[in-house]
A protein has these predicted regions:
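N-terminal secretory/targeting leader peptides
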Residues: 3-4, 8-46, 54-280
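Short beta-strand-centered segments that line the small-molecule binding cleft or hinge
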Residues: 49
Length: 280
């Protein structure tokens, strides 16, 4: 569990941690919606939902049951769709594919016939190198390359359909949080708000240079076939709705996000240039 260190340590040697809440899925079914939603919000949309659309309040209500206080404390944009040892040309290439995948995205691609496993970051390179897995998703290009994925998997696919945003949270033992002074709480919250901004800015700034130099390490940046993306989105809708039917908290978070996005769409559809503006 991503925030387990705060609720399992009876001696209170660990009272806080920094984590991706999607790792809590086994205990808190709604946590992936707080961490990364396939075909979901973009980073600024998530931030707006968290700060002004009820996201903070509903997340706190989920975690108070486990005596944890979560604070939004980091944000990056899309991950890559993954690193593959072979090209992905069609839906058939996904069937039987052995891939490391986390969160709701793993459930979705498994529906298309992939064999999904969840490995810690430190074990992925060796699994790819030895052929135990054929592909992996993990993070951003700069992170993935530092872990050596570009040495053993030469096809890096986009877009990051499974994780168009990645939020990170500071999780604090609830009793510890309550014991802090108002000023200390304000300092922590202010620091995390600054971290969200700087984290996103830095992540956006450094990925392009990594991709631009892919040819020097024999890596090809590729786009997933459009028909595969459409099928992934279709299955994503099914998986998310099924999870909402199974779990009331999941349904509540999903409803909150949908309500926010429905109102936000009035602004988004009018205020921003279309992504394909230059092609119109």
């Amino acid at each position: 569990m991503g925030s387990e260190m705060c609720i399992r340590d009876r001696d209170r040697k660990v009272v806080a941690g920094y984590t991706w809440l999607g790792y809590d899925q086994g205990k808190i079914a709604a946590s992936p919606l707080i961490a990364a939603v396939p075909f979901g919000m973009e980073p600024w949309e998530y931030s707006a939902w968290w700060y002004n659309g009820g996201g903070r309040e509903i997340t706190e209500s989920l975690y108070v049951k486990y005596e944890i206080h979560p604070i939004f404390c980091g944000m990056t944009g899309p991950e890559t769709a993954g690193w593959f040892r072979e090209r992905i040309n069609s839906l058939d290439d996904v069937k039987g594919l052995k891939i490391r995948f986390a969160g709701l995205g793993g459930q979705i691609i498994e529906r298309l016939g992939a064999s999904v496993t969840m490995l810690p970051g430190g074990e992925i390179f060796q699994a790819l190198e030895k052929g135990a897995i054929d592909a992996t998703e993990f993070a951003l290009p700069i992170v993935d390359q530092a872990l050596g994925f570009s040495d053993v998997a030469k096809y890096n696919y986009y877009p990051g359909w499974h994780q168009p945003f990645t939020s990170s949270h500071l999780v604090i033992n609830l009793d510890t949080w309550k014991s802090l002074t108002r000023s200390d709480k304000a300092i922590i919250e202010m620091g995390c708000t600054a971290a969200v901004t700087r984290n996103l800015a830095h992540a956006e700034a450094v990925q392009g240079e990594i991709i631009a130099n892919f040819d020097q390490v024999g890596v090809s940046a590729e786009r997933l076939p459009l028909n595969l993306l459409k099928e992934l989105k279709k299955v994503a809708t099914q998986v998310i709705e099924e999870e909402a039917q199974r779990d009331a908290d999941f349904a509540a978070v999903l409803a909150s996000q949908k309500k926010f996005l429905a109102n936000y769409e009035y602004w988004k559809s009018l205020a921003y240039l279309p992504r394909n503006f230059d092609e119109l």
